Amino acid sequence: MGLKILVFVKQVPDTQNISGNAMTPEGTVNRAALPAIFNPEDLNALELALQLKDRYNAEVIAATMGMPAAAEVLRQSLYRGADRAVLVTDRALAGADTLATSYTLSCCAKKIGGADLILCGRQAIDGDTAQTGPQIAEKLNIPQLCYVEEVKEIKEGKITLRRAIEGGYEILESPMPALLTVIDCNLPRPVNVKSLMKNKRAKTKSEIMGEYKNDPTAAEAEIAKTAAKGLLIEEWSAADIEADPERIGFAGSPTKVKQVQSVILTAGDAKTVEPTADAIAELMHELISDHTLG
């Protein structure tokens, strides 16, 4: 495989189902209290990577940072066609903001090495900052191309793509390696049955150890068996990626979230307007006067 594509994906809390205990006293999201889903725009990034795999016979690596349960989004990535999966998990990574997260993921990218393209969703729905992708690019000192809709061509070490801008789009060319953030621009493919059957037993070392917690010998045997079948999801700690302890997790995060809540917009007073030019003109004047418009 000539082209190597790294896709950073994320398991996020379903922010449409915020409960009363969604925040910890320290100001971080209590992920255990919320249903977990595959971050939507990361699915778009994965789909774009898989389209490039189909076109250029690329290798697609899915990687994520999170709790051990985040291995599920990696399995979902394998089911859709990713070739390899990496989980970066460590208690020291908990409470990370975008600064600490991007540093950790840049360390992960360096350990994987050799990626021609790094793809991320534009933003994660649990933060809506759109900061992590560009920050990774800055830390890796590679070009960043944001709001990508389509890859036109990859040729002679350069990528030509289309990205959305306000009021239209632009066509850009960039040298590789480069990082792309991808918007909701495609329809992510469903799980591939063949890939599902192949990877349904893909697990991390921690998951296997948990299943055989009373029998370490059997656990080691199962780990070796899973690895031999190519089904062991790689699992790295902060030390494995050589991350600076002062720059990760809560310790490396200057941002603290005070509160997360679902906001439901409801109608207040209602006013019926006659479908005449004078009535509509009067309504427009009223809306402009109270600064609802303009």
Named regions from a protein language model:
Residues 1-294:
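N-terminal glycine-rich FAD/FM-binding segment characteristic of electron-transfer flavoproteins
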